[in-house]
A protein has these predicted regions:
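Phosphate-binding P-loop
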Residues: 1-4
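Hydrophobic anchor at the beta1->P-loop junction of P-loop NTPases
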Residues: 7-9
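P-loop (Walker A) phosphate-binding loop of NTP-binding proteins
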Residues: 12
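Conserved nucleotide-binding/hydrolysis micro-motifs of P-loop NTPases
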Residues: 42-44, 85-88, 108-113
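Glycine-rich phosphate-binding loop used to anchor ATP phosphates in small-molecule kinases
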Residues: 54-99, 123-125, 133-134
Length: 142
């Protein structure tokens, strides 16, 4: 029976979590492994679009993604979860639900680098005051 390892990639928007997850996925797929990427943005858009970005809604989205990991754990060898996951409480809950085999990996870059990358245009919006509570820019990441 398969029991996958879960790699919970955390970090601010634009730091490279999804890029790394997709690259590493391709490596393992070429080695014959079954790999699933549960990207936080994609899962939110496809399954949890009713959720906003308040503290409670972010925590709920993290919980629902951890439950998706549990659901798919016996179907794949590796699950990569690139997600901002800004709250320690949510990461601890995911760890308790998914241990053993849960690995939290934090990605980091300075704000200048993130603002230069800004692949989604979020930092530009935040700088202009058009986006409130961008995690790491105007909202806490704890």
């Amino acid at each position: 029976m398969i029991f996958s390892q879960v790699f919970w990639f955390t970090g601010l928007s634009g730091v490279g979590k999804t890029t790394v997850a997709n690259s590493v996925k391709e490596y393992f797929v070429q080695k014959g492994q079954h790999v699933l990427v549960l990207d936080g943005d994609n899962v939110r858009h496809e399954l949890h679009r009713h959720l906003g970005f308040s503290l409670s809604e972010i925590k709920k989205n993290n919980l629902l993604i951890a439950k998706l990991c549990q659901k798919h754990r016996h179907e794949t060898n590796i699950i990569f979860v690139p997600i901002i996951s800004p709250y320690r409480e949510s990461r601890s809950l995911a760890r308790s639900m998914l241990n053993p085999g849960f690995y939290e990996i934090h990605f980091d870059a300075d704000m200048d680098t993130l603002c230069k990358r800004d692949t989604k245009g979020l930092y530009k919006l935040a700088q202009k005051g058009e986006m409130k509570n961008l995690i790491g820019f105007s909202a806490k990441n704890v």
